[in-house]
């Protein structure tokens, strides 16, 4: 059995999957915020309960926001303070007497989608998250590409390309990102960015769902706004696709529920790609909230 943990600032979620990649059991507990020992106990108790329930010693994978293992072997995860700065993988492997694998939550999202029955035919899968921020992951032959610093797939911190500035207007403000850089695409393409663009052009504070509702009603300003956003997304994604050249792009996050993104994006991409490039298949994520657990569990499938 494959045990997948999706760990965040408020909850530890465990999903148990069988060899057919089907969810058999899940359970959630609150994430301890202050005590590392309590954090380890919470994970180990869930593993022990799963082992007893299924009569086996399942493999353990964990998805967590942040850098799973820094150069000194410790975790960096600002949203999980009880475990940040601690050698989480080594400590859990020792306590559970098995190989525990960690990766960041965005890679686990991408891995979950790459192992979908419909998508396993594609060697190179790119996950793109358009949510509170912009991120994602790359999966090659069923295995995450992590890189030295676990920042592969941090697409949101690429800068706006020159033709995006031409498209949006020369007086378009370059916003400072939370990472400290200026002009990161996450500030324009995330759900927050979608709402910020509306306020910038129309001087009216609305949230993304409200703007999308106006678009669905045929509001002219909302139609123009969505058209502008999709063009901006296409030019930024075109840069990424020129580097990565995936077979499939799977889009997750809150904005993935807006069908215009997956239905219209492919038609806008060719003019932002090399003439010989083929537009990849673009799909909405299939597994929703379960994706984090699925992807973490499947960190052991690539063996």
Curated annotation (Swiss-Prot):
Protein's UniProt keywords contain Transferase: yes
Binding site for ATP: 4-11, 133-140
Function summary: Catalyzes the phosphorylation of N-acetyl-D-glucosamine (GlcNAc) derived from cell-wall degradation, yielding GlcNAc-6-P.
Protein name according to UniProt: N-acetyl-D-glucosamine kinase
Alphabetical keyword list: ATP-binding, Carbohydrate metabolism, Kinase, Metal-binding, Nucleotide-binding, Transferase, Zinc
A Pfam family matched in the record: ROK
Organism for this UniProt entry: Escherichia fergusonii (strain ATCC 35469 / DSM 13698 / CCUG 18766 / IAM 14443 / JCM 21226 / LMG 7866 / NBRC 102419 / NCTC 12128 / CDC 0568-73)
SUPFAM superfamilies for this protein: Actin-like ATPase domain (SSF53067)
PROSITE patterns the record matches: ROK
Broad EC category: transferase
Binding-site residues, Zn(2+): 157, 177, 179, 184
Associated pathway: Cell wall biogenesis; peptidoglycan recycling
InterPro entries in the record: ATPase_NBD (IPR043129), N-acetyl-D-glucosamine_kinase (IPR023505), ROK (IPR000600), ROK_cs (IPR049874)
Listed NCBIfam families: PRK13310.1 (NF009835)
Signal peptide per UniProt: none
Acyltransferase among keywords: no
Known EC number: 2.7.1.59
Molecular-function GO terms, alphabetical: ATP binding; N-acetylglucosamine kinase activity; zinc ion binding
GO BP annotations, alphabetical order: N-acetylglucosamine metabolic process; peptidoglycan turnover
Family from the record: Belongs to the ROK (NagC/XylR) family. NagK subfamily.
UniProt catalytic activity: N-acetyl-D-glucosamine + ATP = N-acetyl-D-glucosamine 6-phosphate + ADP + H(+)
PANTHER family membership: N-ACETYL-D-GLUCOSAMINE KINASE (PTHR18964:SF162), ROK (REPRESSOR, ORF, KINASE) FAMILY (PTHR18964)
């Amino acid at each position: 059995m494959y045990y997948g943990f999706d760990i965040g600032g408020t909850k530890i979620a465990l999903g148990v999957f069988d060899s057919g990649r089907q969810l058999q059991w899940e359970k959630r507990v609150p994430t301890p915020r202050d005590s590392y020992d309590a954090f380890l106990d919470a994970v180990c108790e869930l593993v022990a309960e799963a082992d007893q329930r299924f009569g086996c010693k399942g493999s353990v994978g964990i998805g967590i926001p942040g850098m799973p293992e820094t150069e000194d072997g410790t975790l960096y995860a600002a949203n999980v303070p009880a475990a940040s700065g601690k050698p989480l993988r080594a400590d859990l492997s020792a306590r559970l007497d098995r190989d525990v694998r960690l990766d960041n939550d965005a890679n686990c999202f991408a891995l979950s989608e790459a192992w979908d029955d419909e998508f396993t035919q594609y060697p190179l899968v790119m996950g793109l998250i358009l949510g509170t921020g912009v991120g994602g992951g790359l999966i090659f032959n069923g295995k995450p590409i992590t890189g030295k610093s676990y920042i592969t797939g941090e697409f949101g911190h690429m800068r706006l390309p020159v033709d995006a500035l031409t498209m949006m207007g020369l007086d378009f403000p370059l916003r400072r990102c939370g990472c400290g850089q200026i002009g990161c695409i996450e500030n324009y393409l995330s759900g927050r960015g979608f709402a910020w663009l509306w306020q910038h052009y129309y001087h009216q504070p609305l949230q993304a769902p409200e703007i999308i509702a106006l678009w669905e009603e045929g509001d002219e300003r909302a139609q123009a706004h969505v058209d502008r956003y999709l063009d901006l997304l296409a030019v930024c994604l075109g840069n990424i696709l020129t580097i990565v050249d995936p077979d499939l792009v799977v889009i997750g996050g809150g904005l993935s529920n807006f069908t215009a993104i997956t239905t219209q994006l492919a038609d806008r991409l060719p003019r932002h790609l090399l003439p010989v490039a083929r537009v990849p298949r673009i799909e909405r994520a299939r597994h929703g909230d379960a994706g984090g657990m699925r992807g973490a569990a499947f960190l052991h499938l690539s063996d």
